Amino acid sequence: MSFKYFVTNDINIPQYTLTCLLYSIVMIQFKKLINAKALYQEPDRIWVAKGMTFFAVDYSGKRISCVFNVGGMKDRLLGCHRLSSQLLRVGLHHLLPLKNGNILVTAKRRTYLYDKDGNVLNVWTGYQGNKPGHQGVCVTPEGTIFFAEYLLNPNRDHDIHLWRSIDNGMTFNVVKTWEEGDIRHLHFVKWDKYEHCLWLGTGDYGDNGSENRLYRSADSGETWELVGQYSQDWRAIGICFTEDALLWGTDAGSCSDTVHFVRMDRKTRKIEIIQDFEGPCHGCASFAGGRAFFSTGVEGGENEKDRYSRMKEYHDGRCENVWKLEKDCWPLIV
């Protein structure tokens, strides 16, 4: 179990999901809106998924769009129950409104492109893995889409690819490849509105933590600067942005290293460990004004303090717990 967060590229307002429940947050007060999974938030609506369908609701939870159906009957049946959907990774995982008005959604091993009327324009299956990490897909202000491959790859015997689309999701091409044995997988790719660049993270282990890296690209993915590497402190599942720093929690849930909350100064590129977390950081989201939220999960790792998943708010240089829930009875699912 973990809290997961999603944030738009432009307005920096997070959504919060706990299993299949959607909540809104105002001054750290929670209100249940609808039984659904939050995928993307806009100023006047929240895009949510229920099984293999998605639609938009307003801030009272009322549906304000048509219902989009994804995939075949088998997936729709498996996606109706939480246990089967989690075990088999059935369901919808990402949603991106595109610059031309179309909508990109990811499901298990398939990425769909819809127009506003619910017509399927394209189905892409050329990538490895079931799905990207929860911050593994992004779109830039110019409309370029990036898609980061995430697969288990325990033997490091696969090349790993970063994909890019410059035609609103109709075609994708490899823009960068890590050769087999170099890394395990890609964790995230995110647009930074402050530096007008992309950041990308990899994991998980390697000699002296060599697979844990942070990259930066200022030319739409053509070239990538290696900013940091080595140790579990560079192992991030996602990052948050402030005007003067990058923030992340480490994803060191299945190893002995302490899970840290890390700040990287934009000017010096030096990282500072701010505090310890109780479990691996699985999600994060940025607010306007420098506020950010982070979540921890339960994986059964030796460095976890307890069986609680937590939501934390970052302000005044530190993270404080604002909500926690105990791990449920279901098996651990990474």
Segments (PLM) and residue ranges:
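Beta-propeller fold detector
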Residues: 64-71, 121-126, 173-177, 225-231, ...
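Short, solvent-exposed loop/turn segments at conserved positions within beta-propeller repeat blades
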Residues: 105-106, 153-159, 204-211, 253-258, ...
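Short coil/turn segments that connect the beta-strands within blades of beta-propeller domains
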Residues: 43-44, 100-101, 142-143, 195-196, ...
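Asp-box/WD-like beta-propeller blade repeats and closely related beta-sheet repeat scaffolds
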Residues: 118-140, 148, 174-178
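Repeated scaffold domains used in trafficking and secretory/extracellular systems
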Residues: 32-41, 76-80, 85-98, 129-138, ...
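Conserved Ser/Thr-centered positions that define the repeating blades of beta-propeller domains
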Residues: 56-58, 165-166, 217-218, 312-316
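Loop/turn-rich, solvent-exposed surfaces of beta-rich toroidal or solenoidal domains
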Residues: 245-259, 274-332
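Recurrent small/Gly-Pro-centered beta-turn motifs in extracellular repeat architectures
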Residues: 50-51, 106-108, 147-151, 201-204, ...
